[in-house]
């Protein structure tokens, strides 16, 4: 998903039409090998546009390691996903049998898409990972914790509206 978003952004800044063709998979790819064309000095603006179209693009994808979906965190990947993460991390503690957890799950999914590239969203099943839950004092579910620089900054207990979580996220993505 992140790569597709990145490629869509790249396609928007393509120099000229015809250099890229839409593939059946929905992604964009060069229609011919990109080689540097020799610069042609010409009084005609049309020829200079053609030369610019043949130049290799200076495309730099800044979407590296960006995920627009909720990632399942467990005891094996907890440190890498949450503690060592440079961006803020929203973690939902949940259980499959919990009704309010099922109500807030779509909200967390939306937040992952709305804040793609700004935060990482993870979820921890408290039945599968009781040690993580007890480390952070999770006694009720759903509980949402906000981490920044590996430290727990804020917590929200219960199925809360999306606006409540957005307010918390906005506090930590700007600072």
Swiss-Prot record:
Query: SUPFAM superfamilies, alphabetically?
Result: Thioredoxin-like
Q: What is its main location?
A: plastid
The SS bond pairs are 98-101
User: For the Thioredoxin domain, which residue ranges apply?
Assistant: 63-174
CDD domains found in the cross-reference section: TRX_family
GO molecular function terms noted in the UniProt entry: protein-disulfide reductase activity
Compartments where found:
Plastid, Chloroplast
Task: Give the keywords, sorted.
Answer: Chloroplast, Disulfide bond, Electron transport, Plastid, Redox-active center, Transit peptide, Transport
Q: Name one Pfam family in it.
A: Thioredoxin
Q: Which GO terms describe its cellular component?
A: chloroplast; cytoplasm
Q: Where is the transit peptide?
A: 1-62
How this chain assembles, per its entry, is: Forms a complex with heterodimeric ferredoxin-thioredoxin reductase (FTR) and ferredoxin.
- Which protein family is named in the record? Belongs to the thioredoxin family. Plant M-type subfamily.
Its biological purpose is as follows:
Participates in various redox reactions through the reversible oxidation of the active center dithiol to a disulfide. The M form is known to activate NADP-malate dehydrogenase.
Report the protein name in the record: Thioredoxin M-type, chloroplastic
């Amino acid at each position: 998903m992140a790569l597709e978003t990145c490629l869509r952004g790249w396609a928007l800044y393509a120099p000229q039409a015809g250099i890229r063709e839409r593939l059946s998979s929905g992604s964009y790819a060069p229609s011919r090998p990109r080689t540097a064309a020799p610069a042609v000095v010409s009084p005609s603006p049309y020829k200079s546009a053609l030369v610019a179209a043949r130049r290799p693009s200076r495309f730099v994808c800044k979407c590296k390691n960006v995920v627009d979906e909720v990632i399942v965190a467990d005891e094996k990947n907890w440190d890498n996903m949450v503690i060592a993460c440079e961006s803020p991390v929203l973690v939902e503690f949940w259980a499959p049998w919990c009704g309010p957890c099922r109500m807030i799950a779509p909200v967390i999914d939306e937040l992952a898409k709305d804040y793609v590239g700004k935060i990482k969203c993870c979820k921890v099943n408290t039945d599968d990972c009781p040690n993580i839950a007890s480390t952070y004092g999770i006694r009720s579910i759903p509980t949402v914790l906000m981490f920044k620089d590996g430290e727990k900054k804020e917590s929200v207990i219960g199925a809360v509206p999306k606006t409540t979580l957005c307010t918390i996220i906005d506090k930590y993505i700007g600072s």
